[in-house]
């Protein structure tokens, strides 16, 4: 996919979501690096989303994953000292509903505080599980649709007080060997060290 100028909020979310799909397929296939198949997925999805021929999947899928994952910290995989965390902080307009709530251990919850999820991810220097990023993107998209922000220019949103930081949406992802789908995959890694 050739570099193209992304101006609108909608295009930025679509680009981030298409790159997420690319990463998702590579992690699912346990690839060490991205290949032409992954790039093709990204290009087709981005084009399909832009042209209105494809849609982002429903948050219902993410709710099913949340229920299947069970009571673990969705960030680190810990089963200790769990609480509910708002993905979009209520302080900045995040809703108090199931779609915006996930389990978080005391340590991650305290570390994240009222920060934007992507801001917190960047400060940690470690990518979050892909399913959490996917949920974040879907919440961002829904918020923008509901508040008539989806067709705005990106710079119009950067100074607004929103429950997300539009300029921090991930548009590139690390190599698949450094990514995980869900926090539960980290539990075994914790005991190896």
Q: At which residue positions do the language-model features occur?
A:
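A detector for short metal-coordination/catalytic motifs
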Residues: 110-193
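Detector for Asparagine
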Residues: 19, 38, 55, 74, ...
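Short, charged surface segments at domain edges that flank catalytic/cofactor-binding sites
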Residues: 22-72, 131-138, 142-149
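A broadly tuned "polar low-complexity/structure-edge" signature
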Residues: 5, 11-19, 103, 110, ...
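Generic preference for hydrophobic/aromatic residues in regular secondary structure cores
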Residues: 12-15, 20, 82, 139-144, ...
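Nuclease and nuclease-like effector domains acting on nucleic acids or nucleotide cofactors
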Residues: 1-52, 174-193
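Intrinsically disordered, low-complexity segments enriched in small/polar residues
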Residues: 12-15, 73, 118, 171
